[in-house]
Structures are given as structure tokens and as C-alpha cells.
């Protein structure tokens, strides 16, 4: 015997009803099947609104609407399965809804709805589901036995939330003679009290019915069919990268359900656990999925984690006072009164000082709990033995579930670390006595961030880097291409880079999970979200996961002034933008102080030498005790190209024009020939070495006369540049005559004196052969002398710069 239960989403329309019938038929070929059915999706909730709201003449219209849903359902079934007995089924539907109308008319006369009538109204959907399924199966030549839950399942409790007496129900069902070849059908959600009245079983009552019937029939397995593949590691609606759990124990399932997992209710697990009946969660829409099995305890050595859940709309009562100290009586009174009034207490946390206790409950009960506690402790409050109740609202409880979780190393520390990375405060923590759960209380506004962080840290097998990219010009686009190309390599290293935002100066593309890099340009063009700093800061406020990084591939000064704010929000910063590192020494220092305080990384390898490992090499050298003696370098790819062409006999104006055409220069080449860009790079190096200087402290010997500043138009500038062709040709020739070449060089002396100028160098100089856009940096240090440390390679270009940014990105997790 196997029991199958199908929920409302599995019976939402005609096609799904018939799909369920197919599953039943297939299973019935192997063994006898008992089936518990819910009402079609939304029907029970729809009928519940009738009894929850004021009952008036409008209710009859709602009854007709509900009836029409069923009529349309069986019409569709008839079209798909012609042998279905439509008229007989329609007649049953008419009879049931006529009963409802008579009940409603009676209620209208007496102006109230008796408690015993409410379950009759809201259970019509389940009863009709069974009749429809019976007719589908019989039209396919199957024998069907219908179990009446009112006469066979004895309930204890109120009309709308009863509990089943399993022992008595077993006796009743055992007396029924059911043919072995018959398919058994029973309406879920329904039972009967000792007076024989129909009652219902409360929230998730159909699942509970299924577990009870499985116990009564001694079923070898209870299959719960729903619209998900099984139990996932978290709610996929709010958490990315969830995955299906193959197996969980009864206790783990109980903890998951208690702390918010929506797949099963704790009451459902109790009977299958008591009678050791395996349970499997299956997907009606994906019958091939293996589902999640729920069974006996895991192997004691299995410490694997099973899920992270949440309960929201939580409040926390803080109760304090001298009467709590050394007095178990006061605490007992608190929880006795709450239990007597059926108030659900989710967590209890007692202060080590013994004069304070906290407990969490649902926000909807706040007023009533306050009322009964104030009434119970009127004297203590009046005498000052108990302080006014402090209530913290808008909270969420996050819980991590797993076998022997208390014995698993570092779980709590990992939870705190993952939340700390996004500056989420933990207000309280509780450890389950079963050793299967750890629960923490946080602010509701931090739910999405907190649960995603914890899940990524504990359950996702890869290290995730969340990227917010600003700037999609040449470097930004090249970076996206490189990361897409390296996806397989990253996957092998268990690294997942997720782009959450891509932006330029006008608009942005943002996704909660990850932007698909295969078609990001197409989606970016479709995006209508504008970009400005106000919008950006608002967006970043609640989106900082673990390892969240802002990458600045712009040259925007205003954006660079936001770095401290970004770091304080929990983001690492990677920038190819030199503006921050060449700003005032005060701002330069503040960024680093903030990054250190917030435990965030500020990386800028591409500020000097593009993809060359300049900054990282310097930091490694000086952190191991080396000291600079002197530095000389060619720091501009455009000037490296231009001066190399001069050496070959090309005129200055022609060399500059060619450099611009090849993309080496800025839009107006004056910016390159002014030497200011080289000075900025030199400033970055000098500060990295340890010199506290400003840009104005660097001596710049200009390549061009002052008058060339006024030519802001690049065409005009290049035309006027011809005036200097003969001067530079003559200077190049003079140097050549004695075996020298001209190079534009940045220098740092041991005393921190920095200069940028044209130098004439001979063939013994390491910079002699550097041209064609290459950069070269020579460091004379205590460790590297008399032969210097030389770093040489292309120091300009989108691909090499992007590779430097990519390298910094991987350093975030290394």
C-alpha cells in the first residue's frame, strides 16, 4: 500500500487533474494506492473569505462564482477525456452548491454563522475534488472506494483546527473491507468529531490527513505531490543558488517546517515519524524528479546542513525586573498564561544576568499578549518589581537546520561572519535543544540580504563574487568578455562571478541574482533605469552580499569621491580610475583607513602600468622590508609609442596622429603630451612607496609650450603641432649622433623628490629599447641593486587594463 496526496496546485485545472489521474494509474499498476485530495488551487481560500467577512447578499454571488469554476473545470475535462461523465458530475456540483446556498440563506436569517457551519462551507472544494477524480478514474475502468473522513477520522478540538485521534481512527478504518484492486480516495482537510459533525484540520490540513491515513493503512510510503521538486535548501523566491535535498530526517523536517519552510507542516511529520513511514515530496509538473525523501535519523557522523529558513512579521518582548532574579515562579507564570491563551512562543532567550528574559512571537498577537501580561503582573509593575515591557518590532528569525549542528565546527562563526560582511546586526541567538537548529533574530529589513549571505556561505559550493560594474567603455566591455571567456576555468576553481549591476553614465541594468553575460548588451539597451549617484546609493543600500565589489572603469572624479561611502556600505572597491589615488593626501588616507576599519579591500592595480603587476609587486617588496633607492619609468603607453616613432624618424605631429588613430591617446592628444597623466601615475607610485606628497609637488617639464593649452579641438591641436616637428626632429638627431634616444620618464629619488621630463638615455639604460606603447618600470632597491627590478610590457589598451581589473577581482577572495 502506498499513499499519494495531491495539493491544490496539482489540481488547478483540467490538464492537471488528468495528469494526477495518470500518476495514480501508473502507481496502481504496481501496488494498491490510497489518494488524498485537496481542493483545486485557491478554492478553499476563496470559500474561507465567505465566512471571514460579513455575510450578506453578495455572498450568494460569490457562491455562484465558485460553482462556475468547477463547471468550467469539468467542461475542460470532458473536452480532453470524452468518456468523462460530465452530466453526473455537474449534477453533484449543483447539489453541493445548492446546499451551500440554503446554508447561506439560513445564516442571513439569523445574522450570524454558527461555528459548526463554517467547516461545512470551506470544505466543499475537497469533497468535489474527490467526486471529480472518482468519475475520471471510473471512466477509465478503475474500481474506486471512497473513504468518508467524517466517519472514519475521529477528531479532537475545535471546528476549524482539529487534531486526529490516530488510535481510534485506525480501529475504524481497519473495520472497512476494501478490495485489494480498488483505488482508495479520500478528501483531505476533513474529519469528524465524536458527535459525527464535520470539522476541518486547520492550516495544511490535507497534508495532515494524508499522514494520518498513511498511518491508519500502514502504508509503506507517503508521497506528497506538490508544485516543487522537493525540499530546497532555502526559499527559491528570495534566495538564488538553492538546490534540492535528496534526504532529510524526520527531526530535520520538523525543524525546517517549524521555522518557516513551506513544504510540510510540523503536524504532518508527527504521525509519519511516530509510525516510521517514509515520506517523499514530489512534483506533479516534473514527475521524473527524484524528490526529497524524509525518513529515519541520518548517520550520527553526518553533520551536513539541510537548509536556512525564515519567519517574518516577528516581535520580541524584553521583560526585565528584580522579580525575575532567582525566581523561576515569575518566568513560569509568564509562559503559563501565554500557553493557556494559546499564544505561540517561537524562541526564548534568557539573559545571563537572570533579571531579564526575551521571547519572540508573531506580530499579530502583540496587543493581546500585552493585555494578558499586564493583567497578570499588575501588582509587580505597580511595585516596580517588573519594568515596562519593551517590544522590538519588525523582526525576522533566520534558522539554519542540520543534523548535529551544534557539533559542527564554526557554523555559528560562519553565520555571524556572513551577516557581518553586510553590516547586519544579530539581536538574539538561540540553539535548538534537539541540536538540529541555530536561530538568530535580525531586523526585517535585512531579511533578503541576511538569508542570501548565510545560504551562500553555508550551502553554495562555490565562492561567489557579486560585481557592480560602473563604466562599460573599452575597458568595461573587455572585462565582461574576459570573464565570460573564463567561465569554465572559474567553474573548475569553484568560483562564481555574478554581475548584479552594469551601468554607464546614463542608465543601469540591475538584477537581483545575476546578469547573463551572453546577452547583457541587448538587455542593457532595453533597460529604462536611469543612473545617477542618488539612484545608485539607494540601490546599493540593501544589496551588499558577501564578497560584493564595485568596479569603477570610468575616469569620473565625482564617482571616485563616493568610495568611502561604498566601503561603509560593505563593498570592496576595484578601480582603474586614478582620480581617488591622486586626490588630496587627506582623501587618499581616509579611503585606506576606512577600508582597514571595515575589513574591505581597495584595489587599483591598473592605476599604473595597466595589467602589469606593479602595485602588487611594490606592496610585496616593501611588506618584506625592502626600501627604495630610486625609480625611473616610462609610464605612458601613448608617449612610449610617440617617442619610439620619433626615434624612427617620424615627425612629432605624424607620430601623434598615428597614436591617436591606434587608440593610444586621449580624445585630445594634448592631455597625453601635457605630461599630467604620467605625473598622476608617478604620484600613485610615490605614495605607495610611502612618500606623503601631493600632485603639485611633482616637477613636470612640459613637452609642449604653454600656448598649446588653448587648442582644445583635437584637429586644431594636431595641425598646430606641426610647428614643433622640426624642433623635435633636430633634438632626436642630436641624441642619435651620440648613440642616445629620447624618452619621457618619471623619476623618484630616495628623498621623495619626483619629476617628469624628457630624458636622453644611452643603450645601457633598461629603458633604452622601450617603445611601441610599452611601459617599463625600473626599481633600484636594497634587494635589487646594482641590477634593478624591471617590469616591462604593454601599459595601455583595453584588454591589458581589463586583465588587471580581472586579476584584482580574483584577489578579493584570495
UniProtKB/Swiss-Prot annotation:
The keyword Translocase does not apply. It comes from the Bacteria. Na(+) binds at residues 605, 608, 610, 612. Pathway: Amino-acid biosynthesis; L-lysine biosynthesis via DAP pathway; (S)-tetrahydrodipicolinate from L-aspartate: step 1/4; Amino-acid biosynthesis; L-methionine biosynthesis via de novo pathway; L-homoserine from L-aspartate: step 1/3; Amino-acid biosynthesis; L-methionine biosynthesis via de novo pathway; L-homoserine from L-aspartate: step 3/3; Amino-acid biosynthesis; L-threonine biosynthesis; L-threonine from L-aspartate: step 1/5. Its cofactor is a metal cation. Residues 319-400 form the ACT domain. GO terms for molecular function: aspartate kinase activity; ATP binding; homoserine dehydrogenase activity; metal ion binding; NAD+ binding; NADP binding. Residues 470-814 are annotated as: Homoserine dehydrogenase. A sodium ion is seen in the structure; a metal ion may subtly affect the relative position of the nucleotide-binding region to influence enzyme activity, and could increase the stability of the enzyme. The keyword Transport does not apply. It catalyses: L-homoserine + NADP(+) = L-aspartate 4-semialdehyde + NADPH + H(+); L-homoserine + NAD(+) = L-aspartate 4-semialdehyde + NADH + H(+); L-aspartate + ATP = 4-phospho-L-aspartate + ADP. NAD(+) binds at residues 474-475, 503, 554, 797. Residues 1-248 are annotated as: Aspartokinase. The active site is at residue 681. NADPH binds at residues 475, 554-555, 576, 578, 797. Its EC number is 2.7.2.4, 1.1.1.3. GO terms for biological process: homoserine biosynthetic process; lysine biosynthetic process via diaminopimelate; methionine biosynthetic process; threonine biosynthetic process. Residues 249-469 are annotated as: Interface. InterPro entries: AceGlu_kinase-like_sf, ACT-like_dom_sf, ACT_Aspartokinase, ACT_dom, AK-HD, AK-HSDH_N, Asp/Glu/Uridylate_kinase, Asp/hSer_DH_NAD-bd. Homotetramer. In the N-terminal section; belongs to the aspartokinase family. In the C-terminal section; belongs to the homoserine dehydrogenase family. Bifunctional aspartate kinase and homoserine dehydrogenase that catalyzes the first and the third steps toward the synthesis of lysine, methionine and threonine from aspartate. NCBIfam families: asp_kinases, PRK09436.1. This is Bifunctional aspartokinase/homoserine dehydrogenase.
